[in-house]
Every structure is written in C-alpha cells, then in structure tokens.
Amino acid sequence: AGDVIYIVR
C-alpha cells in the first residue's frame, strides 16, 4: 500500500 497513516494521541 502507498498509504500514510499518522496517528497522534
């Protein structure tokens, strides 16, 4: 996949 997933909690 070429997705960028950036999760900041």
UniProtKB/Swiss-Prot annotation:
GO molecular function: acid phosphatase activity
GO cellular component, one term: extracellular region
Swiss-Prot/TrEMBL catalytic activity: a phosphate monoester + H2O = an alcohol + phosphate
PTM per Swiss-Prot/TrEMBL: Glycosylated.
Further remarks about this protein from its record: In L.esculentum there are at least two isozymes of purple acid phosphatase.
Summary of subunit composition and partner proteins: Monomer.
Protein name per Swiss-Prot or TrEMBL: Purple acid phosphatase isozyme LeSAP1
Naturally occurring in which organism (per UniProt): Solanum lycopersicum
